[in-house]
């Protein structure tokens, strides 16, 4: 049997509290965030101690059952002289009946999400395409404002996207659609991760989410996922840091859990 000091237990409790503020990542992912971030009041060892003392975080398990020294300032990435070309894989996701458009930039794996009109499914096809086009252009504009150049948008055979393709091409965007029913795998994996994390957050709450809170919870989950360093990343930095230039900060980024 292993024994822990009072200080070790207190840090383990703090680590478990911050895990909720991160949207319930698994412990290994949380360790990556802490190791590459700043201003955390605990270390990766404290996360491991928390798993030994309390067991693995239950909400992070249940959410997936369905299928570093303090710095005085916030470091911001200086934009490159030349825009970086990106491919953006996109798809439409439904959470609690609410439609979202999800975009994943490659090779940065930065996730973008926008909620569509809640009456999206009841709209005529022409109106649906206008809603989708507006959301896509907002995402593209956000990337261009950070000196990135989305040169290719990849979709599956969504009818709403097919109808707005000419308008997107007129604005200089190349749209590539895969065969109908052949979903873009990178987006499918991301959507699965978003839904798993959303379920973990939902299970931690003592109340039912309204439509507005559902949107806010999805945005919260995506924000947390963008702070997570991919296991296959060669640079060792999070997607948020790669795009926004903001290093993960334990003091400012995880003050509160959702709800």
Language model features with spans:
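Residue-level marker of conserved, structurally anchoring positions within well-ordered domains
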Residues: 1-51
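Generic alpha-helical structural element
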Residues: 3-7, 19-23, 176-179, 183, ...
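Retroviral integrase
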Residues: 8-9, 38-196, 231-259
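Terminal peptide-recognition signature
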Residues: 18, 91, 225
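Short amphipathic alpha-helical interaction elements and helix-loop-helix interfaces
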Residues: 24, 28, 36, 145, ...
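Surface-exposed, charged/polar loop-rich segments
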Residues: 180, 187-233
């Amino acid at each position: 049997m292993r024994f822990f000091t009072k200080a070790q237990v207190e840090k383990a409790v703090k680590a478990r509290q911050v895990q909720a503020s991160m949207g319930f990542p698994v412990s290994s992912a949380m360790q990556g965030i802490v190791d590459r971030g700043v201003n955390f009041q605990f270390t990766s060892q404290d996360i491991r101690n928390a798993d030994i003392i309390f067991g693995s975080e239950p909400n992070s398990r249940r959410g997936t059952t369905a299928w570093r020294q303090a710095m005085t300032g916030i470091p911001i990435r200086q934009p490159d002289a030349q825009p970086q070309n990106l491919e953006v894989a996109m798809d439409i996701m439904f959470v609690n009946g609410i439609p979202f458009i999800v975009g994943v930039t490659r090779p940065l794996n930065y996730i973008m999400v926008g909620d569509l009109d809640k009456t999206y499914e009841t709209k005529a096809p022409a109106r649906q395409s206008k809603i989708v086009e507006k959301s896509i252009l907002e995402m593209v504009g956000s990337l261009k404002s950070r000196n990135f150049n989305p040169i290719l948008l990849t979709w599956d055979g969504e009818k709403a996207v097919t109808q707005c393709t000419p308008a997107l091409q007129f604005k200089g965007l190349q749209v590539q659609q895969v065969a109908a029913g052949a979903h873009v795998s990178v987006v499918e994996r991301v959507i699965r991760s978003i839904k798993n994390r959303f379920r973990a957050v939902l299970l931690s709450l003592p109340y039912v989410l309204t439509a507005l809170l559902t949107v806010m919870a999805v945005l919260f989950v995506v924000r947390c996922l963008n702070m997570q360093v991919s296991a296959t990343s060669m640079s060792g930095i999070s997607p948020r840091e790669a795009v926004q230039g903001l290093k993960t900060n334990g003091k400012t980024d995880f003050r509160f859990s959702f709800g």
